[in-house]
Design a protein with these regions (language model features):
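Rossmann-like S-adenosyl-L-methionine
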Residues: 1-124
C-alpha cells in the first residue's frame, strides 16, 4: 500500500509497479497520509511494517499516534530533517518502539543536506 498526497506520485508509483511486475500486488492511494492513517486506525487495519518519508516539517502527532495504535512490528522513518525526525522518533519511542538502527545517507554531496534513515521495532 502506498499513500501519497500528490496524484502525480501515484501515477509514477503505478507505472513502476507495472514495470516490475507488481501491479497486481500493490495498491496506491492519493490521500493525505495523516487522514489515511486515522482511517486505518479507526478501521483497525493490520499493518506489519510502515515506511514513512514525511516532508521537512516531519509527521503530525495524529499520524504518529495512529501509527502507534496500528502497532506495526517495524517502522522505517526516512527524513531530510534530522531535527524533526528526532522529535518524531521520541514520540514513537514513548509509544512502545525502540530505535534499532539510525543511518546517515549523503544523497547531496558538497551540501549541508543529508537524509537519515531510522529503523524502529515494536517492543514486545
Amino acid at each position: 500500500m502506498g499513500v501519497e498526497r500528490n496524484a502525480a506520485g501515484i501515477i509514477d508509483a503505478k507505472a513502476n509497479a507495472e514495470l516490475n511486475g507488481l501491479a497486481n500486488s500493490c495498491e496506491f492511494v492519493a490521500k493525505d497520509a495523516t487522514e489515511f492513517m486515522l482511517e486505518a486506525a479507526r478501521e483497525e487495519r493490520r499493518i506489519d511494517a510502515l515506511s514513512i518519508d514525511p516532508p521537512r516539517a516531519g509527521s503530525t502527532p495524529e499520524f504518529l499516534d495512529a501509527a502507534i495504535s496500528l502497532a506495526p512490528r517495524r517502522i522505517t522513518y526516512i527524513s531530510c530533517n534530522p531535527q524533526t525526525q528526532c522529535r518524531d522518533l521520541q514520540h514513537l519511542m514513548q509509544g512502545g518502539y525502540h530505535l534499532e538502527r539510525l543511518s546517515l545517507v549523503d544523497m547531496f554531496p558538497h551540501t549541508t543536506h543529508v537524509e537519515t534513515v531510522a529503523v524502529l521495532r515494536r517492543e514486545q
